[in-house]
């Protein structure tokens, strides 16, 4: 499926360039090599994640490996954390113009999620040289209370 010098960066471009409907696309995980399910392909596309190309073959990442990589990256490559104002001061840019992904599921944060970090004084984390935060789903998943 090699596309040569014009290798598409994401699943939707790959489907368009190859003339393949998303439901017919078959990709393997770059980490564990298992075939991605239809739900994993859709989630990969919605999260705007980039394909990895090896020897002219595109790879994605399954849900389990994405979560595992998020945890590993956070533990191994965390640099420091700042409140929104500190991030804006360091980067000389508004957080609204920056691509900030969730450190767990890797989805790009939308304006409301960035606002929540600002309004609730939650820190953003510099991990592997990139700013990361929590999306709405992972935020609620990490703060759920266990009944006693």
UniProtKB/Swiss-Prot annotation:
Keywords: Activator, DNA-binding, Early protein, Host cytoplasm, Host nucleus, Host-virus interaction, Inhibition of host innate immune response by virus, Metal-binding, Modulation of host cell apoptosis by virus, Transcription, Transcription regulation, Viral immunoevasion, Zinc, Zinc-finger
Any single Gene Ontology cellular-component annotation: host cell nucleus
GO biological process: DNA-templated transcription; regulation of DNA-templated transcription; symbiont-mediated perturbation of host apoptosis; symbiont-mediated perturbation of host ubiquitin-like protein modification; symbiont-mediated suppression of host innate immune response; symbiont-mediated suppression of host type I interferon-mediated signaling pathway
GO terms for MF: DNA binding; zinc ion binding
InterPro entries recorded: E6, E6_sf
ZnF locations on chain (unnamed): 29-65, 102-138
Cell location: Host cytoplasm; Host nucleus
Tree of life domain: Viruses
Presence of the UniProt keyword Cell membrane in the record: no
Pfam families recorded: E6
Keyword Transcription regulation: yes
Role according to the record: Plays a major role in the induction and maintenance of cellular transformation. E6 associates with host UBE3A/E6-AP ubiquitin-protein ligase and modulates its activity. Sequesters tumor suppressor TP53 in the host cytoplasm and modulates its activity by interacting with host EP300 that results in the reduction of TP53 acetylation and activation. In turn, apoptosis induced by DNA damage is inhibited. E6 also protects host keratinocytes from apoptosis by mediating the degradation of host BAK1. May also inhibit host immune response.
Note from the entry: Belongs to the low risk human alphapapillomavirus family. The cancer-causing human papillomavirus E6 protein has a unique carboxy terminal PDZ domain containing substrate but low risk E6s do not possess this domain.
Family: Belongs to the papillomaviridae E6 protein family.
Subunit structure: Forms homodimers. Interacts with ubiquitin-protein ligase UBE3A/E6-AP; this interaction stimulates UBE3A ubiquitin activity. Interacts with host TP53 and EP300; this interaction inhibits TP53 activity.
Protein name stated in the entry: Protein E6
Source organism per UniProt: Human papillomavirus type 10
């Amino acid at each position: 499926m090699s596309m040569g010098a014009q290798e598409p960066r994401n699943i939707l471009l790959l489907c368009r360039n190859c003339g393949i409907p998303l439901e017919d696309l078959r990709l393997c995980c770059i980490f564990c090599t298992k075939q991605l399910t239809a739900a994993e392909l859709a989630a990969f596309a919605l999260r705007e994640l980039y394909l990895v190309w090896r020897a002219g073959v595109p790879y994605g990442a399954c849900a389990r490996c994405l979560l595992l990589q998020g945890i590993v990256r956070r533990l191994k490559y965390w640099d420091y954390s700042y409140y929104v104002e500190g991030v804006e001061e360091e980067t000389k840019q508004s957080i609204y113009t920056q691509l900030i992904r969730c450190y767990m599921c890797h989805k790009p944060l939308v304006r409301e999620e960035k606002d929540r970090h600002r309004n609730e004084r939650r820190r953003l984390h510099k991990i592997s040289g990139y700013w990361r935060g929590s999306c709405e789903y992972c935020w609620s998943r990490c703060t759920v209370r266990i009944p006693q």
